[in-house]
Amino acid sequence: AGETWADSYACRLRWMQYCAGIWGYSTTNFTECAGFSGSLYSNYVNAGKYARHIPYYVKTNMPEQEAAYSDLTEVARILLITKGIQASDVYGSLVYTDGWGTRNGNVEILEPTFQTQEELLTTWNQELKEAANKLATSSNQVTFKNYDLAYSGDMSKWVKAANAVRMRIALRLLKQKPAEAKAIAQEGLSSGNIFSSI
């Protein structure tokens, strides 16, 4: 409930002028609140710690089962990118490719490189595409359906989620790179069956 409040009601809805009240918020509609934007960044950093540690942990401790944990790794990547988009909307450049080095066994990168939002969107689009393809074609996976609060381990729904997040990327690119945005949207819509169940 806290993230829904901060992200939707208290922040975005009023910034987009969908509603005008300032309940629960002591400044004007157009004043940035560090508490809300800080929580988006914290959520991104925390998601990254786990998303980057999962494949490293499996590779280090259970190398013979690495292929069986592909779905878990890709779902974590989708969640991390979703959080990254939210944080990048507020902060712009973020650490991503070089981030969480000690969590993925790369202890040599002590000063990771920040990437611009444009670079991040390109990277994230490609990674979401890869994640959707891997989830759609994987077999003999360790199940985590009892821990998957979103889709109860249904990987076809995670494929749709990956393609839906690609739609977010297309929307962010629409004014600056309309041809690229259109290509992403068409590819995502055709490959993800996003609207097949509506």
Predicted feature locations:
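Beta-strand acidic-aromatic groove motif in beta-rich domains, primarily in extracellular
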Residues: 4-11, 92-95, 181-182
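Aromatic-residue-lined binding/catalytic grooves and analogous aromatic/hydrophobic interfacial grooves
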Residues: 6, 122-144, 155-198
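Residue-level preference for alpha-helix termini and adjacent loops
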Residues: 89, 93-95, 148-150, 154-157, ...
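Carbohydrate-binding/catalytic loop surfaces
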Residues: 102-109, 147-156, 198
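Acidic, glycine-rich segments characteristic of secretory precursors and extracytoplasmic regions
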Residues: 1-17, 38, 53
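Conserved, well-structured interaction surfaces
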Residues: 19-97, 102-143
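A glycine-rich, coil/turn loop motif that links secondary-structure elements
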Residues: 67-74, 147-160
